[in-house]
Amino acid sequence: MVTVMPLEMEKTISKLMFDFQRSSTSDDDSGCALEEYAWVPPGLKPEQVHQYYSCLPEEKVPYVNSAGEKLRIKQLLHQLPPHDNEVRYCNSLDEEEKRELKLFSNQRKRENLGRGNVRPFPVTMTGAICEQCGGQIKGGDIAVFASRAGHGICWHPPCFVCTVCNELLVDLIYFYQDGKIYCGRHHAECLKPRCAACDEIIFADECTEAEGRHWHMRHFCCFECETVLGGQRYIMKEGRPYCCHCFESLYAEYCDTCAQHIGIDQGQMTYDGQHWHATETCFCCAHCKKSLLGRPFLPKQGQIFCSRACSAGEDPNGSDSSDSAFQNARAKESRRSAKIGKNKGKTEEAMLNQHSQLQVSSNRLSADVDPLSVQMDLLSLSSQTPSLNRDPIWRSREEPFHYGNKMEQNQSQSPLQLLSQCNIRTSYSPGGQGAGAQPDMWAKHFSNPKRSSSMALKGHGGSFIQECREDYYPGRLMSQESYSDMSSQSFNETRGSIPVPKYEEEEEEEEGGISTQQCRPRRPLSSLKYTEDMTPTEQTPRGSMESLALSNATGLSAEGGAKRQEHLSRFSMPDLSKDSGMNVSEKLSNMGTLNSSMQFRSAESVRSLLSAQQYQEMEGNLHQLSNPLGYRDLQSHGRMHQSFDFDGGIASSKLPGQEGVHIQPMSERTRRRTTSRDDNRRFRPHRSRRSRRSRSDNALHLASEREVIARLKERPPLRAREDYDQFMRQRSFQESLGQGSRRDLYSQCPRTVSDLALQNAFGERWGPYFTEYDWCSTCSSSSESDNEGYFLGEPIPQPARLRYVTSDELLHKYSSYGVPKSSTLGGRGQLHSRKRQKSKNCIIS
């Protein structure tokens, strides 16, 4: 068809050009032009023809039987559509439309049609400007002139193009409109719309306009089923309209989840050639079915997952297996242990000085808990199994630990005092117990390893800051302690003007990568016991698994513990119920089911212990307050470990009466409750490491500690509230004399606080000095050794629940004991500590 049309088409175009015929003179003058070219511009000599085509791109020169000739034929059909001029080339025109076409074609011929005139630009003229490119046309150059545009208008041969399509005007045929030249197609479109379906000019009164184009009303139909789409919904695909049904059947995608069509009205998600319904049920994790809409996802083998755990087929909520639970916690513990060991030598001397000046009983907070261990703890609680004795928290065979000559003052405390210690308000060191009584108490306490769970809650045991024998000797677990566990013991602390080195170890710890918070002791704040039996309802487990999530969310790590503690209230402890899951194994092994422990104590709560310990000094030691110790570069009142006696001539690393003895550096052991020992007994600080597997074997030895109850019921005398009030008046008066500019540290704090808030008047005073002396929250979350009393990496907890005890009941229960001479505690701490304890309920039953 292409080979037949050129001659006919050329005749048609000649008629359109007002019966324009090639001039015979032009053909004769061109010489061999007709033989070489398919078409030559009329009126040119052969050399001018060659000059003209030399200006055009080679691929557009219409040589005979060349690509240029084919291009010319194609452009004739495209630029001069026959159906724009002849009715016979149109389809399905009614009579009115045929008349319209004739009128339209004749009007265009009369007013717009023309052919360009090619001739050399006269040499006598100075030159002209090309209408298209603006370039100069010099004399003698070949130029194209358009009579309809005017005599002075000319173009370079390659610039004689359609204004719309920028294509060379085939055979120089143009249509002039409003100062611009067009090809026949685009000129007709300037006057009438063209149907996108039949490519004919639309002469009807109505048409459909869609996608920026026009259609005859009957022609705008589905490309597949030819359903008229005028006023209907349609979908364009590759420039063709489709009805919704045909499009869904031909092009709709299938959902990879439900294998159903994704309708045109349904949203869809697409990734790497895959498609899903944009719904929570389809675009979700392939393992846990969690919706991934608006969330990142992990593609793997044609499926999408919400996490790496799901992509590996693991349980995203955690596994029952102790091997797979909290692997990240174990990794953090191993890194923490390596860091502590690496900085051991660097911080040993600095921590020695720090510990000799400040020995505050507090416990380390851990953010690492094995869920299975928590479950085993709760099982142990509910079954009221025998408690476990704690293994030594720190102990070094190479570095002995000795106590001073004040150990005999640490053994007796009244229940009021103990409860007040739980309230972090006051504490005191009663005297009156001889040094010889302490070894006997040790023998009674540890001669029989069997202690029941109730004994762990209400028996006699270590004092509030007492170091039990297990703390320093290997092979056994430490006894569990609750709020009532401390009734027979107490602590003492000496204050004096002792030249102790500055706290440079804090800076070394910061530089060495070990936070001071990594040195938090592990003994619980609530290490108190009662001797009376609890009712079954009072022995229900009180752990809380939701505190595990809370503790992990708070970021209590070795690096972040200090920041968290700085945010705590100055006069209140954090919600101790949140700590029940932090290190349940360590905590419950010391205090049964009581969740509040020193592990969750903030820096302010530690300071409140310090303020509490100030009550231990009597008037004889009060004059020492005038000689403050050095804390860093500040002159403040330092504090000595309760078991140490210093004099100015002895180095801070030595103990009185012990040659070559120095204190275990704080990088290897935590600040703990000090216990009274005889002067000649040597203890080795050491932080033991327990393996989780070895702990699990000792879940079977829960009934090994029962006989201590009878042996530990010999308690030192206790004091009553009247002595405490009297001492408080004397103490406050003497403090006002000795420290006139100091605010009252022992003023009673309001009771109208949260049952978990512990009033602390000491925090404001000691805040500037102990802000950087916070305790480690993460350094020993999972110690490793082969000692007993652990199951799957965590100690077996013991149940307990305390109840409110009236003053009469306390006097009745402890009437056999006298109140120590320096008792400074009243009944205020009792109800407050019970309220603290009462608010800790276990959410796992």
Swiss-Prot record:
Keyword match Zinc: yes
GO molecular function: zinc ion binding
Residue ranges of the region described as Disordered: 314-346, 483-546, 558-581, 642-700, 823-845
S-farnesyl cysteine lipid attachment residues: 842
Annotated knockout phenotype: Null mice are viable, but show an increased seizure rate compared to heterozygous mice, indicating a dosage effect. Heterozygous Prickle2 +/- mice have a decreased seizure threshold compared to wild-type.
Propeptide residue range(s): 843-845
GO BP: blastocyst formation; embryonic brain development; establishment of cell polarity; establishment or maintenance of epithelial cell apical/basal polarity; maintenance of postsynaptic density structure; neuron projection development; regulation of postsynaptic density assembly; response to electrical stimulus
Domain PET: 18-126
Compartments, as annotated in UniProt: Nucleus membrane
Classification via PROSITE patterns: LIM_DOMAIN_1, LIM_DOMAIN_2, PET
InterPro entries listed in its UniProt record: LIM1_prickle, LIM2_prickle, LIM3_prickle, PET_domain, PET_prickle, Pk/Esn/Tes, Znf_LIM
Residue list for modification Phosphoserine: 92, 319, 321-322, 544, 547, 608, 643, 732
Repeat in keyword set: yes
Location of Phosphothreonine modifications: 535, 537, 540
Residues annotated with Cysteine methyl ester modification: 842
Keywords assigned by UniProt, alphabetized: LIM domain, Lipoprotein, Membrane, Metal-binding, Methylation, Nucleus, Phosphoprotein, Prenylation, Repeat, Zinc
Family per similarity comment: Belongs to the prickle / espinas / testin family.
Alphabetized PANTHER family for the sequence: LIM DOMAIN-CONTAINING PROTEIN (PTHR24211), PRICKLE-LIKE PROTEIN 2 (PTHR24211:SF18)
The protein's name: Prickle-like protein 2
